From Swiss-Prot:
GO terms for molecular function: nucleotide binding. The keyword DNA damage does not apply. It comes from Coxiella burnetii (strain RSA 493 / Nine Mile phase I). Gene3D superfamilies: 3.30.70.860, YajQ-like, domain 2 (3.30.70.990). Keywords: Nucleotide-binding. One of its GO terms (cellular component) is cytosol. InterPro entries: DUF520 (IPR007551), UPF0234-like_C (IPR035571), UPF0234_N (IPR035570), YajQ-like_sf (IPR036183). Nucleotide-binding protein. Belongs to the YajQ family. This is Nucleotide-binding protein CBU_0114.
Amino acid sequence: MPSFDIQSELNKHEVSNAVDQANREVATRFDFKGSGATYKYEGNSITLQAETDFQLKQMIDILQNKFAKRQIDVAHMKLEDPIIQHKSAQQTVMLLEGIDQTAAKKIIKLIKDQKLKVQAAIQGEKVRVTGKKRDDLQSVIGLLKEQEIGLPLQFDNFRD
């Protein structure tokens, strides 16, 4: 039976490259000269450090542009509240990866509401969809691309 997986994954190498490019741009921009503004990429988070809140907002914009140039969906980014002190401002950007249980249940409910002859099952941080016809699977992909789920989804592991 044909099947495919729905997942939400990040290419960590591309994220690292985007952060490096953003660091280079901040180091060479005139309005950031001598400010000590930096990005630090650790695990599933990126920490932004600058002198003012305004610089943090500019740094977020730079990071989003670098993500877009590297074909990384900016929906993977979840901005935490900034921590602003006397001469420094810091903000953490969490990188969302994988489909959590609530999002997986929402995806399965959307698929079942269409009354297509497919089965969807949660497998860890992925959702596997199986069906008898390839056309049904393609209509599920079209449906999920139209819906606003709040996560960037990738469709892979197609099998016949």
